[in-house]
């Protein structure tokens, strides 16, 4: 035992326990005590050196152990010395102590079949389900030895019959038992041919079909290995599966044949349905091997012989169709599809389909074929990617492949009526048939970053994708960049607009229902224009991504992206293509063209604004000023950079200033005319909020109210009843009547649209900070409409977006009840009215500050940079006093 390193007293105690010498153990543990009884029968008497050591030495600890961790109690239990075990337990020996291999005293007694000792240990609280480091339990070691009495005792004491996982309370297991075979007590008894123990375990519910990990052997296979016919019969009677295959694909019948146990083989032969493969079958390659070799004829023979082979799954969970899609052999793909291979099956590792494999490996012809055969483009891999997402991840994606997948994905979304919560494509709809995709013939390509913004572009309300609370003078990186500005790539030529569906920036707030609504075709125009005018660079630097925001998105806290909405003011007439859009009724306000949104779809002319500079959409340049309308109305566009920025948008400084000077003279008269201008054919549209200051004035330090000249030219008696608001500050360019407008709805829309336009045009105002979702939740709770909260959360509608919703938007969100929509619209109207008054006070304060500042700095103002702020004060004060 290697006791040389132990103290003499410990060596004597361990030797006495191993030999069953109770007297010596008592002398060592109780110095000075008289022996009560002699040594146990069969035990060696203690030598004179042991007696002297016991008389002269100090007491020896009862839980001492040798180098292997075996304690005195374990040695006594292994030897079956019941009196010594009883004495050690009385002296306080630990009943559940383990040696270095995880063996306890009970396991030692069970291994050797000592029933009385095992019973004594169980009475003192020994763990009946303890396991050693090999994962063997107390019941397993007892079954291995065939000790029927101990097995029965353990089962009656509560031992788990199929306990094959390591016990977590064992201090020495270390979790390594999970990597072992997982042998159960039944398997141990079968392996060693103990029929009585097998019968007892089966009566206690042992699982006859439990298999050992890593090798896949069952108890029936172990019986076949030993040729134990009686044991095999017991197992089959209890439900053992004779068709079970090991990892070597062998059954118990084949094991018996290999071991030449004829009687056992004859017994298992009629019970086994999985027949052994012949030598020819073993030599014949499977369909995966044939696909890897590209042998079309062999694949065809295998598929003809058994069509089920086309849907086999290999170790990685891949199907033959996936392998063919990777290799790029179109004839093989066609053959497998004709044999009814599952095109939409996903592998078990990554969740990829055959379409994803073909897309990722650039096999364009296979992608076309699979799409024509109806492969599902909406399926997502385990990481959430679709086939379209995968092609966008490529460093140099094939442009035609991108168009192909994009058109089909849009058609799928169109067929489904509306995009799901996570559609597979960043764009919404397409006009091409699914089976025969027709792609735009252009040479550009989508950028890889476009897929990152897909979820934002498809939302009902897009303003939550824009940064909030940005300063009015924040630099914008699209000014002098060598590549095309995004608004330029999105526009169509002005002379061709009547033949197109309309610019995408005008379609994002329309409805999906109803004939002639451009929303159902917006995504196609968006995709087509992006493909035709995509920037030549394959990737954009990461530091530019924050600036890649399409100009047609509704503004959040400044009006940079509303420039393209000024088409109604170009050349003094409305854009014919925009008259097909539903209206958002709006009260007139001093910024932009002075007029209100009407309810009809007739084109409206604005002769007073014919001198306005071209908007960025038609000029191809981008205005730096966050408050510029791109020259749409010629007013409200002066920023801190003065006329220089207006000239960048294609306009003239003199033209802008002359219009400003002319229009600011009639700011007061304009406000008086407003109630008369708000009547419309669809119902009352009188605003519930007081008129506000020009929202572009406070933040930019320059801006203007409408003057007398513009008011005179836009006299209500001469304005068509369907007058469209020429301001570019509208967050929803909706210009045609809703399907079923009502008076209350129109009134709510008026307040929502007008107030939101004014609040958004103040670049650094407080309106951009209203983003608390709790506020929106509280509003819905007050209205007792909490059931619609998940709808707003799903569409990411924050408080800022909520204030811009119209009746049509609410219907599109899924709020079908008229009463609920009316409640929400009334709440929006009241909120916009209150926030408008708050902004008015703030704007007046900021305006007074700028007026004082400009007056002090008027001596240093460079000529041509715009009029002094001091000259802008009187019209604003007049307007405020009349409010």
Swiss-Prot record:
Biased composition (Polar residues): 649-661, 852-862
UniProt keyword annotation of Phosphoprotein present: yes
SUPFAM superfamilies per the UniProt record, alphabetical: Ankyrin repeat (SSF48403), SAM/Pointed domain (SSF47769)
GO biological process: determination of left/right symmetry; heart development; in utero embryonic development; kidney development
Gly residues bias (residue ranges): 631-640
ANK repeat placement: 8-37, 68-97, 101-130, 134-163, 181-210, 215-244, 282-312, 316-345, 350-379, 383-414
Cellular localisation: Cell projection, Cilium; Cytoplasm
Taxonomic superkingdom: Eukaryota
Residue numbers carrying Phosphoserine: 649, 732, 740
Boundaries of every SAM domain copy: 771-834
Keywords: ANK repeat, Cell projection, Cilium, Cytoplasm, Hydroxylation, Phosphoprotein, Repeat
Biased composition annotated in UniProt, kind: Basic and acidic residues: 566-576, 874-883
Keyword RNA-binding among record annotations: no
Gene Ontology cellular-component annotations: ciliary inversin compartment; cytoplasm
PROSITE patterns in UniProt: ANK_REP_REGION (PS50297), ANK_REPEAT (PS50088), SAM_DOMAIN (PS50105)
Regions of compositional bias (Low complexity) in chain numbering: 607-630, 687-711, 720-737, 748-768
Signal peptide start-end: none
Distribution of this protein across tissues and organs: Expressed in kidney (at protein level).
Residues annotated as site: Essential for ANKS3 interaction: 821
CDD domains attached to this UniProt entry: SAM_ANKS6
Region annotated Disordered, chain positions: 30-50, 414-439, 490-522, 566-773, 852-883
Chief localisation class: other
Maturation and modification: Hydroxylated at Asn-129, most probably by HIF1AN. This hydroxylation results in decreased NEK8-binding.
Record note on quaternary structure: Homooligomer. Interacts with NEK8. Central component of a complex containing at least ANKS6, INVS, NEK8 and NPHP3. ANKS6 may organize complex assembly by linking INVS and NPHP3 to NEK8 and INVS may target the complex to the proximal ciliary axoneme. Interacts (via SAM domain) with BICC1 (via KH domains) in an RNA-dependent manner. Interacts (via SAM domain) with ANKS3 (via SAM domain).
PANTHER family: MASK PROTEIN, PROTEIN KINASE DOMAIN-CONTAINING PROTEIN
Descriptive protein name: Ankyrin repeat and SAM domain-containing protein 6
Record organism: Mus musculus (Mouse)
Originating gene: Anks6
């Amino acid at each position: 035992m290697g006791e040389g390193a132990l103290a003499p007293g410990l060596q004597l105690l361990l030797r006495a326990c191993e030999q069953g010498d109770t007297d010596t153990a008592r002398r060592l543990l109780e110095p000075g005590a008289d022996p009560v009884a002699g040594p146990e029968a069969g035990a060696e008497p203690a030598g004179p050196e042991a007696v002297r050591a016991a008389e002269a030495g100090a007491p020896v600890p009862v839980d001492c152990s040798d180098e292997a961790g075996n304690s005195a109690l374990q040695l006594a239990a292994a030897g079956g010395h019941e009196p010594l075990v009883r004495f050690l337990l009385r002296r306080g020996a630990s009943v559940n102590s383990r040696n270095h291999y995880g063996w306890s005293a009970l396991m030692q007694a069970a291994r050797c079949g000592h029933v009385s000792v095992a019973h004594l240990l169980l009475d003192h609280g020994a763990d009946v389900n303890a396991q050693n480091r090999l994962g063997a339990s107390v019941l397993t070691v007892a079954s291995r030895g065939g000790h029927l009495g101990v097995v029965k005792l353990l089962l009656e004491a509560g031992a788990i019959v199929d306990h094959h996982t390591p016990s977590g309370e064992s201090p020495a297991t270390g979790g390594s038992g999970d990597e072992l075979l997982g042998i159960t007590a039944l398997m141990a008894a079968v392996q060693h041919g103990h029929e009585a123990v097998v019968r007892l375990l089966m009566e206690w519910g042992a699982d006859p079909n439990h298999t050992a990990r890593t090798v896949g052997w069952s108890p029936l296979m172990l019986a076949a290995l030993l040729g134990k016919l009686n044991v095999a019969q017991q197992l089959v009677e209890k439900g053992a599966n004779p068709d079970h295959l090991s990892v070597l694909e062998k059954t118990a019948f084949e094991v018996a044949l290999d071991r030449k146990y004829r009687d056992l083989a004859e017994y298992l032969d009629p019970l086994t349905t999985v027949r052994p493969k012949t030598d020819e079958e073993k030599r014949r390659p499977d369909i995966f091997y044939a696909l890897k070799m590209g042998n079309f004829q062999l694949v065809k023979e295998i598929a003809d012989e058994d069509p089920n082979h086309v849907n086999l799954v290999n170790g990685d969970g891949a199907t033959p169709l996936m392998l063919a899609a990777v290799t790029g052999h179109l004839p093989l793909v066609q053959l497998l599809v004709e044999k009814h291979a599952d095109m939409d099956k996903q592998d078990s590792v990554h969740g990829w389909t055959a379409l994803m494999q073909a897309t990722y490996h650039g096999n364009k012809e296979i992608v076309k074929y699979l799409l024509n055969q109806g492969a599902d483009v909406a399926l997502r891999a385990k990481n959430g990617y679709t086939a379209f997402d995968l092609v966008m991840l490529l460093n140099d994606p094939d442009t035609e492949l991108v168009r192909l997948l994009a058109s089909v994905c849009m058609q799928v979304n169109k067929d489904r009526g509306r995009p799901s919560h996570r559609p597979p494509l960043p764009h919404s709809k397409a006009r091409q048939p699914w089976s025969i995709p027709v792609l735009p013939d252009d040479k550009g390509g989508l950028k890889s970053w476009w897929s990152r913004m897909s979820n934002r572009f498809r939302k009902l309300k897009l303003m939550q994708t824009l940064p909030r609370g940005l300063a009015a003078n924040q630099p914008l990186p699209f000014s002098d960049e060598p590549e095309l500005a995004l608004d330029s790539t999105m526009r169509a030529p002005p002379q061709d607009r009547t033949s197109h569906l309309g610019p995408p920036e005008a379609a994002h707030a329309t409805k999906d229902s109803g004939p002639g609504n451009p929303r159902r075709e917006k995504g196609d125009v968006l995709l087509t224009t992006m493909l035709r005018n995509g920037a030549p660079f394959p990737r954009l630097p990461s530091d530019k991504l924050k600036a890649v925001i399409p100009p047609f998105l509704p503004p959040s806290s400044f009006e940079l992206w509303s420039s393209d909405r000024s088409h109604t003011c170009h050349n003094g007439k409305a854009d014919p293509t925009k008259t097909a859009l539903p209206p958002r009724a709006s009260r007139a306000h001093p910024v932009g063209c002075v007029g209100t949104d009407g309810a009809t779809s007739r084109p409206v002319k604005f002769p007073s604004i014919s001198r306005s500079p071209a908007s960025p959409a038609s000029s191809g340049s981008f205005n730096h000023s966050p408050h510029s309308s791109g020259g749409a109305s010629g007013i409200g566009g002066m920023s801190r950079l003065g006329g220089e920025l207006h000239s960048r948008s294609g306009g003239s400084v003199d033209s802008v200033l002359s219009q400003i000077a002319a229009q600011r003279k009639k700011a007061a008269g304009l406000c008086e005319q407003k109630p008369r201008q708000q009547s419309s054919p669809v119902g009352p549209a009188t605003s519930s909020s007081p008129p506000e200051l020009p929202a572009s004035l406070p933040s930019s330090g320059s801006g203007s109210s409408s003057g007398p000249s513009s008011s005179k030219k836009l006299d209500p008696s001469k304005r068509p009843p369907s007058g469209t608001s020429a301001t570019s500050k509208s967050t929803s360019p909706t210009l045609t009547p809703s399907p079923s407008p009502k008076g209350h709805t129109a009134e709510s829309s008026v307040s929502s649209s007008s107030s939101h336009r004014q609040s958004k045009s103040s670049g650094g105002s407080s309106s951009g900070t209203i983003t608390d979702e709790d506020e929106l939740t509280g509003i819905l709770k007050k209205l007792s409409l909490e059931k619609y909260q998940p709808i707003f959360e799903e569409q990411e509608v924050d408080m800022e977006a909520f204030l811009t919703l119209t009746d049509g938007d609410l219907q599109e969100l899924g709020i079908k009840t008229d009463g609920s929509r009316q409640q929400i619209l009334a709440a929006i109207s009241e909120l916009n009215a209150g926030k408008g008054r708050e902004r008015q006070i703030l704007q007046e304060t900021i305006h007074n500050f700028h007026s004082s500042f400009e007056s002090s700095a008027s001596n240093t103002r460079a000529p041509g940079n715009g009029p002094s702020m001091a000259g802008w004060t009187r019209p604003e004060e007049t307007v405020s006093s009349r409010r």
